[in-house]
From Swiss-Prot:
Its cofactor is Mg(2+). Residues 10-133 form the RNase III domain. SUPFAM superfamilies: dsRNA-binding domain-like (SSF54768), RNase III domain-like (SSF69065). This is Ribonuclease 3.
Length: 230
């Protein structure tokens, strides 16, 4: 039997997800980090959700891009299911306030750690499928989460990571390359949370956060690109 809390910490979570659970304990399990319990946590649901997400996104890309080859479709899928993309969806769903973490994990900033947020999104996908046993319903829910991002995915240059795109943008205009500075590291390896500032001549300082220095730099670069596109 799954051990659960009596109610969700955020009663509006199901509305944001777009699904009302028949077995609320499945959603609670999907929100429970292994730091709380080695037996009752989201890892099995995450395993299932990871496979389901890959299939849903692969099917969408196959239908939406009938003339793209396998290599480009694979790279597009990787862009949409990587940790950075799932972290953005977690933020859209406001999952950080709903995570069930140990006191130690909470103090180390686990509720903002991109890897945990991404894992939780996959676990929720698995939980919805187990609860509903309806793949078509799950597909519609997941693609609705992805609406803000599907329109911006391109088979070509958008597949490059934000740091590469920013560097190419500046080089093409003969401007100085960006400088990345780590300003804060929380927690202990391997569960660290990094804050990195990206400095570009003529633009305000922009901060990015992530579960690794690389992810934090990519997040900061993505924010700089948004400023340049305005």
């Amino acid at each position: 039997m799954i051990k659960t809390q009596s109610k969700l910490s955020d009663p509006r979570l199901q509305s944001r997800i777009g699904y009302e659970f028949k077995q609320l304990e499945l959603l609670q399990l999907a929100l429970t980090h292994r730091s709380v319990s080695h037996k009752y946590n989201y890892e099995r649901l995450e395993f299932l959700g990871d496979s389901l997400l890959g299939m849903i996104i692969a099917n969408y890309l196959y239908q939406a891009y009938p003339h793209e080859n396998e290599g480009r479709l694979t790279r597009m899928r990787a862009t949409l299911v990587r940790q950075e993309a799932l972290g953005k969806i977690a933020n859209d769903l406001k999952l950080s306030r709903c995570l069930i973490l140990s006191t130690g994990e909470l103090k180390s900033g686990g509720h903002h750690r991109e890897s945990i947020l991404a894992d939780t999104v996959e676990a929720i996908i698995g939980a919805i499928y187990v609860d509903s046993n309806d793949l078509n319903l799950l597909k519609n829910i997941v693609l609705k989460w992805y609406i803000p991002y599907l329109d911006h995915i391109e088979p070509t240059d958008q597949l490059k990571d934000p740091k590469s795109r920013l560097q190419e943008y500046l080089q093409a205009r003969k401007k100085p390359l960006p400088v990345y500075e780590v300003v804060d590291i929380q927690g202990d390896a391997p569960n660290q949370h990094f804050k990195v500032v990206c400095l570009v001549e003529g633009l305000p300082r922009v901060m990015g956060e992530g579960s690794s220095r690389r992810f934090a730099e990519q997040t900061a670069a993505a924010e700089i690109l948004k400023l340049l596109e305005q």
